[in-house]
């Protein structure tokens, strides 16, 4: 075995046995430093003949490259090993159960909880969720919903208008979630069964009104939808939402531009105590509006009212949350008060289901 082969084996064995970066650095200096073993061999190239320099010089340079690569590889291996050891030392078992303790501060806002509850109920009936933009055109917010220009019903909405654009058109903060009905009819073919939860905006603010509030509405479109179907859907919803076995409802004639006939729906309840109890008592409370979709709205959605018909309903999420969970002031929903959230909020992992209980 030649001198260079012996030196190569010795250096590679020492490098492989190095336990830390300090040992690796000492080996590098001993082999490749100014007075290292390989550096000393390179100094002898000047005393060699051209033929010897061509053969032996090439072998010395090859040895230098091999040792340099081995040192770099060992440094990288030691660094990877150190990272792996640290990761193992600092591992957190994410499979541990959530501990119920005073440190558990996060709560689900009641509005988010109500949306999840309503989604669970209507999802069980075969409805899907639809969404749309908060900033709407005048067409989708009013005209397509049978509010023509100058219609007196437009005065019922204290609307937030944006400045006119270059074409003179003013966009609005939507005053209801109904524009999504038109957008859905334009994009999908019947049968349609959707609910539309979302934010809406009107210029109003007191204990029971807010400039920004939440609504949910539903829409059913097919060839045979009728008032009896609508009544059944709403009764089943109220029983599930208020978690009672039976509800008594009354439908009062009303007026909405986008439905005909239109109804306001009251539910029987007991208001004699501090908490409203549903499914019993002799009192009545209005909870939503509904009706059969107006033929003009169907036409605006691209459907033939001689072939299709449907029904729709809408209710305020904030209002039904207040009724169900006994919250006295709507403005508290938006105050970001941690104490209020601790009292009225919900545990993050308690997802509402019909099987497990909506508000358990």
UniProtKB/Swiss-Prot annotation:
Keyword Metal-binding belongs to the record: yes
Biological-process GO terms, alphabetical: phenylalanyl-tRNA aminoacylation
Annotated GO MF terms: ATP binding; magnesium ion binding; phenylalanine-tRNA ligase activity; tRNA binding
Cofactor: Mg(2+)
Matches recorded under SUPFAM superfamilies: Class II aaRS and biotin synthetases, tRNA-binding arm
Reaction catalysed by this enzyme: tRNA(Phe) + L-phenylalanine + ATP = L-phenylalanyl-tRNA(Phe) + AMP + diphosphate + H(+)
Location in or out of the cell: Cytoplasm
Gene3D superfamilies named in the record: Bira Bifunctional Protein, Domain 2
Subunit structure: Tetramer of two alpha and two beta subunits.
Family named by the database record: Belongs to the class-II aminoacyl-tRNA synthetase family. Phe-tRNA synthetase alpha subunit type 1 subfamily.
Positions with a binding annotation for Mg(2+): 260
EC number per UniProt: 6.1.1.20
Gene it is expressed from: pheS
Protein keywords: Aminoacyl-tRNA synthetase, ATP-binding, Cytoplasm, Ligase, Magnesium, Metal-binding, Nucleotide-binding, Protein biosynthesis
Record text on cofactor binding: Binds 2 magnesium ions per tetramer.
Protein name from the UniProt record: Phenylalanine--tRNA ligase alpha subunit
PROSITE patterns, per the entry: AA_TRNA_LIGASE_II
């Amino acid at each position: 075995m030649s001198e260079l082969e012996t030196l190569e084996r010795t250096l590679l064995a020492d490098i492989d046995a190095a336990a830390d970066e300090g040992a690796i650095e000492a080996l590098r200096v001993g082999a490749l430093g100014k007075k290292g073993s390989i550096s000393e061999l390179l100094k002898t190239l000047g005393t060699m003949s051209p033929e010897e320099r061509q053969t032996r010089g090439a072998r010395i340079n090859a040895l230098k490259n091999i040792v340099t690569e081995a040192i770099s590889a060992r440094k990288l291996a030691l660094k990877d090993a150190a990272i792996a050891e640290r990761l193992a030392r600092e591992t957190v078992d994410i499979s541990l159960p959530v501990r119920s303790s005073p440190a558990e501060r996060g709560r689900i806002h009641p509005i988010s909880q109500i949306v999840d509850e309503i989604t669970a109920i209507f999802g069980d009936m075969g409805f899907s969720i639809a969404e749309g933009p908060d900033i709407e055109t005048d067409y989708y917010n009013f005209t397509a919903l049978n509010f023509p220009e100058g219609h007196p019903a437009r005065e019922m909405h204290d609307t937030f208008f944006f400045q006119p654009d270059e074409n003179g058109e003013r966009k609005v903060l939507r005053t209801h979630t109904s524009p999504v009905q038109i957008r859905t009819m334009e994009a999908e073919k019947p049968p349609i069964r959707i609910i539309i939860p979302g934010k809406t905006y009107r210029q109003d603010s007191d204990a029971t009104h807010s400039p920004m509030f939440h609504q949910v509405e539903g829409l059913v479109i097919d060839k045979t939808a009728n008032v009896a179907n609508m009544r059944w859907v709403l009764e089943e919803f109220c029983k599930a939402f208020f978690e009672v076995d039976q509800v008594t409802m009354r439908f009062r004639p009303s007026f909405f531009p986008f439905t005909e006939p239109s109804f306001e729906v009251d539910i029987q309840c007991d208001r004699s105590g501090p908490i409203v109890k549903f499914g019993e008592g002799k009192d009545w409370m209005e909870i939503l509006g509904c009706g059969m979709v107006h033929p003009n709205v169907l036409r605006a959605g691209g459907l033939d009212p001689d072939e299709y018909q449907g029904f729709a309903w809408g209710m305020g999420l904030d209002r039904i949350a207040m009724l169900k969970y006994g919250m006295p002031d709507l403005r508290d929903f938006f105050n970001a008060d941690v104490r209020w959230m601790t009292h009225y909020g919900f545990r993050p992992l308690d997802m509402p289901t019909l099987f497990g209980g909506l508000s358990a």
